[in-house]
């Protein structure tokens, strides 16, 4: 530890006047471990804490802001300050937060007031987190102050839910007993947020509201003795009884909403779906306290009111997701079968196979709203399935094939067509299909090769390929350009047409600027789906070629855009090389050219296959044969010499006779190795017979062509090279040796004179 450092008292004196970079330098200096010293605790560090408390209690908002940040830094990096003065600093910050909350409307009117609220809340949260799990500090400094901090945070959560709800959620999870007196107050605040302001909240804040509502069920409900049944007293009480009560209450509120959809679609046409709807859980009258949502007000004369159906289902799905996905201090019982049945019912609410009610008034506005809300109702089932599969994995393995079959209902088809996908509707459901592909990827990772190729996979491939293209917003404008021009000529409004031309000039001159490009997260999900499909199935030729085209073109575009090919596309190219399917042409050369700057071991091995070196050098390892081995070597050498001498003696006469008739004969030099000859006389006899037959068949030709004939000219004279070898193949049958010799090598035809033939007969 360095002995020379800035005194804490010096830093404390400069805190009041420090601004900007000077204040940042002081905070960075206080993080040094040299100040963690008991000798400094009573004098220097106590003086620093006094200055910090002075800043926090100051009426100046900037001094308050500096005091909050300084207290957080010193408590986080100096355990001595946290242990001795942490409770004092927390109480000071909380008191200022309580004061500011009383004047919330006036404080929040300025921009720095919003930032000050954010700083106060985050400072309280950080110091609480620093004190947790420290027994003495938590018992003596934190818990007594939480009873005063929690009411203020609950009040403030009505105005700043995004800032306060994470803090309350951690307190509710860790200090459940301390939070118990304030449960009803917090429940009221959450219900007001759900009923009145839920649709106007952001996605993150909506999730926080639902999670806090679920964590309220960690507290056990004290049931009065009058309502208890003495006959049920012997039953086991589970730790998650209150949690399960809340879960089942939310789950049972889906059925009335789905029954309202029965006024739009005729459920009686599908008996299985009708029975499944009846089997859904119903709200128990004894648990009416859990039902706090108001009833829906729908009017078919005002079709836009039908949008309340998917909005209510989305709210219930968010709350159910919180109950089945949040971590709890005890194991919980989740009705996976009931949730799966609910999702099947939601996916079945579709006009794909169910007709509309005959009593409905069929007008364009009502039909348009119905066609829009039905996919959103189905999407809530897909969301629940995604959470169930991601959290519980193979626990729902028995449901996976049914899930894939139900997903097919979500893919829109054109009316009065033979399973032709309606890509116009698909384009408007891009966000929903991203969730579908995440769900399918998780399911296929558990199933894989157990599945045969099914229609839903082929349809999802078509959807993925369509959505992988960048969406051009002005395609419809160009398609209807002629009709627009005709309308303009009929109206003859010159001034409006000129202004319209000026407004539309960018559309016609720079159409590439009106394009919605896909994100990398979308490409990653699509590529994972394609990789799974290629690994597990042999796709038909058309979709397989389309996937190849997609991977190559998008890789080139992204390489030009980012300077490199993303990892998901590298994995897709590797998968396409390893699984070519029924295609005969491999994309290996294209993939290598795209990934030439990437040292990929797989592509390197495919281009330059190598035998493991460790297996090669052992093949030629010399063996120590000893004296017996040397004797065997001598015997083998002698046998080879005798075989060579006998073979030379047998072929000597024929070679001399062939040398006398070399005037018009070209002697071949064989291109391959000389075959192993067993009996030369048999070959000469066979060759002479073949030569006679060939002369008779080719008498009309001027030249006789012999197979593998070459002229060997070595200076002044011709030299015939004849190599004969005798090996172990003498033991093979004569017929096999003749066939092999005929295929590998042919002896040139040699014409003998009549005198020489007579001499042979006399001999």
Swiss-Prot record:
Primary location class: nucleus
Modified residues (N-acetylserine): 2
One example GO MF annotation: chromatin binding
Residue span of region Disordered: 722-763
One Pfam family hit: RIX1
Superkingdom of the source species: Eukaryota
Compositional bias (Acidic residues): 736-763
Region annotated Interaction with MDN1, chain positions: 663-763
Spans annotated as Interaction with IPI3: 2-233
Cellular compartment(s): Nucleus
The keyword rRNA processing belongs to this UniProt entry's keyword annotation: yes
GO term, biological process aspect, one: pre-replicative complex assembly involved in nuclear cell cycle DNA replication
UniProt modification remark: Sumoylated.
CC per GO annotation: cytosol; nucleoplasm; nucleus; rixosome complex
Keywords, alphabetical: Acetylation, Nucleus, Ribosome biogenesis, rRNA processing, Ubl conjugation
Record-linked InterPro entries: RIX1_N (IPR012583)
Function: Component of the RIX1 complex required for processing of ITS2 sequences from 35S pre-rRNA and the nucleoplasmic transit of the pre-60S ribosomal subunits. Regulates pre-60S association of the critical remodeling factor MDN1.
Similarity annotation: Belongs to the RIX1/PELP1 family.
Complex formation: Component of the RIX1 complex, composed of IPI1, RIX1/IPI2 and IPI3 in a 1:2:2 stoichiometry. The complex interacts (via RIX1) with MDN1 (via its hexameric AAA ATPase ring) and the pre-60S ribosome particles. Interacts with NUG1. Interacts with IPI3.
Other comments on record: Present with 7820 molecules/cell in log phase SD medium.
Protein name per UniProt: Pre-rRNA-processing protein RIX1
Species annotation: Saccharomyces cerevisiae (strain ATCC 204508 / S288c) (Baker's yeast)
Organism placement in taxonomy: Eukaryota, Fungi, Dikarya, Ascomycota, Saccharomycotina
